Amino acid sequence: MNISTTRKDFMIVNMGPHHPSMHGVLRLIVTLDGEDVIDCEPILGYLHRGMEKIAENRTIIQYLPYVTRWDYLATMFTEAITVNGPEQLGNIQVPKRASYIRVIMLELSRIASHLLWLGPFMADIGAQTPFFYIFRERELIYDLFEAATGMRMMHNFFRIGGVATDLPYGWVDKCYDFCDYFLTRIVEYQKLITRNPIFLERVEGVGVVDIKEVINWGLSGPMLRASGIQWDLRKVDNYECYEEFDWEVQWQKEGDSLARYLVRIGEMMESIKIIQQALEGIPGGPYENLEIRCFDREKEPEWNEFEYRFISKKPSPTFELPKQELYVRIEAPKGELGIFLIGDQNGFPWRWKIRPPGFINLQILPQLVKRMKLADIMTILGSIDIIMGEVDR
């Protein structure tokens, strides 16, 4: 008769690659001792598309449609960083109206990104209802995007020196209505989630990061502010026209998954405040600085030359990048999104290095999940908020 014995060696479990609709195609190799996590190794690269190398073979205008595929849930921010770099290198002035439109679009995109973080995060820890609620509000934001840009996602709206089109008639009133409605929905979320005892049991004290670790790991965004550091690039760098608005940096000092949730909920309310102020104070004037459009050619072509024989050969505007280096950054929903740009006195960047917030924040995951339970992995991973498009690039 065979007597069954208890196995005492560690078990290695593959979590993932996850479905793209959740956290992206991330694979975790987890070493378990029963329910306890001994080690965790993230495996990246399933969504690598060579975005940095593609940038070296495209003009900025040609590259704009590519960048919306980094963080495909907050595409306005990747567009903003792509045009901000050449604008600063070339000392290009952005009209005031265009800057206000950009801020409105960025903050709407921030709310949409946080909403699509909140739903799957709650689903990860067992609450299904918020997952359906958040799509109700997110749909309204996408309706606004569609009215202004023509696209619900992958907007391709930002241009060097401004934006592609002006806001359509009646759009501002629609946006006002959305802001008033969304504030009531935020209150509903807080009643439903924030004091829920089951939710608190799953997130309070789970995945704690202290101030020293946050700085050493180079974390940013809600991960940084949830650990007691009031650092928001909208206040620090004053890019676009954020210094003209009255709003507060959202932060907590506990550093756990609950603190990160509270920071993001607070940020959605602050974004509404910024949008309302921008809608009230939006000035008139041009929406794009058309004077800085220059064509990279030595002479004007003749009417019978080869270039004019095909309509597809009509040249797009190209912007010559000076021979300089520049690091430009903005506060994306997930943290500091930066680009290190080297110009080479032509239309193509010599180097285009992306600093994605999700990739940096994901590094601390193995340390956070060690000595935790298996069920806590999804709670901690969800609270970090990653999108594999920008992690793998």
From Swiss-Prot:
GO molecular function terms attached to this record: NAD binding; oxidoreductase activity, acting on NAD(P)H, quinone or similar compound as acceptor; quinone binding
SUPFAM superfamilies: HydB/Nqo4-like
InterPro entries per the UniProt record, alphabetical: NADH_Q_OxRdtase_suD, NADH_UbQ_OxRdtase_49kDa_CS, NDH1_su_D/H, NiFe-Hase_large
Membrane topology category: Peripheral membrane protein
Entry keyword set: Chloroplast, Membrane, NAD, NADP, Plastid, Plastoquinone, Quinone, Thylakoid, Translocase, Transport
EC number(s) given by UniProt: 7.1.1.-
Record field: catalytic activity: a plastoquinone + NADH + (n+1) H(+)(in) = a plastoquinol + NAD(+) + n H(+)(out); a plastoquinone + NADPH + (n+1) H(+)(in) = a plastoquinol + NADP(+) + n H(+)(out)
Gene Ontology BP annotations: photosynthesis, light reaction
GO CC annotation terms, alphabetical: chloroplast thylakoid membrane
Membership in a protein family: Belongs to the complex I 49 kDa subunit family.
HAMAP family: NDH1_NuoD (MF_01358)
Binding partners and assembly: NDH is composed of at least 16 different subunits, 5 of which are encoded in the nucleus.
Protein name in the entry: NAD(P)H-quinone oxidoreductase subunit H, chloroplastic
Gene source species: Glycine max
